[in-house]
Design a protein with these regions (language model features):
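A catalytic-pocket lid/entrance helix-loop region that shapes and gates access to the active site
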Residues: 56-89
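Conserved alpha/beta-hydrolase catalytic His-Asp/Glu region
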Residues: 85-142
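Active-site loop/oxyanion-hole signature of alpha/beta-hydrolase fold enzymes
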Residues: 1-30, 211
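Conserved hydrolase catalytic core segment
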Residues: 24-69
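Conserved catalytic-core motifs of eukaryotic protein kinase domains, centered on the activation segment
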Residues: 1-4, 64-67, 172-173
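Conserved loop-alpha-helix segment in the C-terminal half of the alpha/beta-hydrolase fold
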Residues: 154-197
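Core-facing hydrophobic residues within beta-strands of well-ordered domains
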Residues: 11, 24, 49-50, 186-189, ...
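Catalytic histidine-centered segment of alpha/beta-hydrolase-like enzymes
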Residues: 197-206
Length: 220
């Protein structure tokens, strides 16, 4: 990317994927965290394009403060020419150790597997994340939760909301239900809690998560 990644582009990405892989049938969308937010917004923007939606801790951020806009624009401009490369590691084990440090519930063996999927080996023999560091650049515009909620209200897909039992993200659901989205997709969706997992459910308890998703898709 020449600059930062723009949030609306993620929505367009899903639409392009549908055109390529499922032009004649609705999608079954699964998204985690920001990906869950993107998937849920798309499901409201094009409800006819999504039959099933699995939102794994993807309810976005709290509403942003417009008063922070000047500093956000300043930060965006200043960071354009200050892209920081990802750290290099001596081995997969070193990267795996860092992954485990941030996700206490996974074993070192699983962390090594995750590291092998996330990383690439450089000519120097070092290990580096296989990702674009520009994805870390700030966006010029702040997150507008009210716009996301407007999209969520239009979701017609069968929906599964997934939370980690040890995650604080579950608290995000309470204000949503108590606000102005009564009789919405969220109140009519199925909600499950995954034991032994925080926010990174797909790393910490993937077997339990996969089972819940499979049951949801097969039985709905």
């Amino acid at each position: 990317n020449e600059s930062c990644y723009w949030f609306p582009d993620y929505l367009a990405d899903i639409d392009e994927i549908k055109k390529i892989f499922s032009p004649d049938k609705p999608l079954m969308l699964i998204g985690h965290s920001m990906g869950g937010n993107v998937a849920s917004m798309y499901a409201g923007i094009f409800p006819e394009n999504v039959s099933h939606l699995v939102n794994v801790e993807g309810f976005g951020l709290k509403e942003s403060d417009p008063n922070n806009a000047p500093s956000r624009y300043q930060q965006w401009i200043e960071k354009q020419n200050d892209v920081q490369s990802f750290r290099e590691y001596d081995s997969l084990y070193d990267l795996a150790s860092r992954i485990k440090k941030r996700n206490q519930n996974i074993s070192i063996e699983r962390a090594i597997y995750v590291a092998s999927q996330w990383a690439e080996k450089l000519d120097t023999g070092k290990i580096k994340l296989r990702a674009d560091p520009k994805h870390k650049l700030p966006n010029a515009t702040q997150y507008r939760r009210s716009e996301a909620e407007a999209c969520w209200r239009l979701i017609s897909a069968k929906t599964l909301c997934v939370f980690g039992k040890n995650s604080s993200f579950f608290k995000e659901v309470i204000p949503i239900q108590e606000n102005n989205i009564n009789k919405s997709w969220l109140n009519n969706s199925k909600t499950v809690e995954i034991p032994g997992a925080g926010h990174m459910i797909h790393l910490e308890n993937p077997e339990f998560l996969a089972n819940e998703i499979e049951n949801f898709i097969m039985n709905e």
